[in-house]
Amino acid sequence: MTAYSKHYNAIVIGIGAMGSATCYQLARRNKRVLGIERFDIPHDLGSSHGYTRIIRLAYYEHPSYIALLRRSYELWADIERTSGEQLLYRTGSLDCGPADSWVFKGSLQSCVEHDLPHEVLTGAQVSERYPGYRLPRENLAVFQPDGGFLVPERGTVAYVEAAHALGAEIHGREALLDWEPWGDAVRVFTDRDEYTADALVFTAGGWNQNVLPFLRGLAVPERQVLAWLQPTRPELFRPERFPVFNCLVPEGRYYGFPVFAVPGFKFGRYHHFEETGEAETLSREAFREDEDVLRDFAARYFPDGAGPTMILKACLFTNTPDRHFLIDLHPDHPQVSFAAGFSGHGYKFASVIGEIMADLAERQATRHDISLFNLARFTGQVSQLHQQKMDMLARGAWTPAAHGPAHPLYRGDSQRGREVPGGALGRLHDHRQPATVRPSGDSGRWSLTDTADPRHWTDSDVKPFW
């Protein structure tokens, strides 16, 4: 190893949200770390910009996310203390849709299962409490008070500055040309220099598939467009009067934010026009047809927010086939790890992803349950990380108390270690079984009741969360 003076404990490729947090976590462990970013730090060509990003504790996508979210909130508070800057703003969050929709049911179930404070509101009640909203009266919404938004560009800067203060070396405008295993270590070649490291971490967003060919087709870049419209009644769209939202309506699934940083109410449609391609070539321009589909939504459901257009901006999603993340060790080289495919709902996790990736770089294992995110679910090729877990399970050496859940479908912290893969809760989060939402007794609380036997499921019952 001494043949190369530019040797590091870890090199991180891609210094956006995930990479900057990873550099910080490694540096605070006294590791010699190098971060390499091909663009500016921060930049607006990937998925870590746009003034605001939603964070929410109610999570309809899958129960495995809740434990990570709790840790993510803790770590965002940690970097706020370190930087002296507010990065997380709590507005509350609303997950809205028809009573039988997977958005509403999944959000409610996550609150019930994990004992999160929440309220169930009708569309009419939402509009009464938050007059900027004009949802269908018969729709239902879960309000969870811990939701809000993060400031992405400032988050990246905060992590980079904190990493610098701990001795990390971070280079912008330096492009990766190639990498190769070098015994148990790696060699990295850029357009400026050559380096070696004990571990290599890829957090390169839409560019991951270019340097990890096995991710091609599994972490696919997609063009996404956001609008900022000047409200005609701006007082209704201030953070204290306008929760962040995820709304499922006949036109699609939309998400949005109060006015912050720029004079516009920000919102977008998930998977906009489903335009996929190479991160390098997908258009970052926004066009009239982009504006039209977004403006039509605002005019119908947020009419007091549908004033003049302030900004139209494109960014990237990087999607997996099932819209769950990809976080794992390289299947052939365990000194290499990657975090990819955050599918439009990853930024909020950046703080905990940094901790996970630092774990993988340091010891090729993590304290967190990331079994939902393994590569083998698509390829059948099991990484060393998950082979270790399966071997421990076979020996009876895996204990939830010491290692976390062995199965991705677990209840909350109060019932950790109790699997529910075949029960109604597990099925609900997979969105495979219809349910009825109804008031529970005289308390006015809402609950979910099974209305179908899983033995009688049909293809039409199987609904992926996106």
Each predicted region: which residue ranges?
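Beta1/beta-strand and adjacent pyrophosphate-binding region of the FAD-binding site
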Residues: 4-18, 34
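Active-site substrate-recognition segment that forms the wall
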Residues: 24-28, 84-90, 194-195, 199, ...
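Glycine-rich FAD pyrophosphate-binding loop
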Residues: 27-48
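Dinucleotide-binding Rossmann-like beta1-alpha1 core, especially the glycine-rich loop
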Residues: 52-129, 139
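Short beta-strand to alpha-helix junction loop
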Residues: 67, 95-103, 143-162, 282-290
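Helical element adjacent to the flavin cofactor pocket in flavoenzyme catalytic cores
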Residues: 143-199, 203
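C-terminal catalytic lobe of FAD-dependent flavoproteins
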Residues: 296-403, 407, 411-413, 423-425, ...
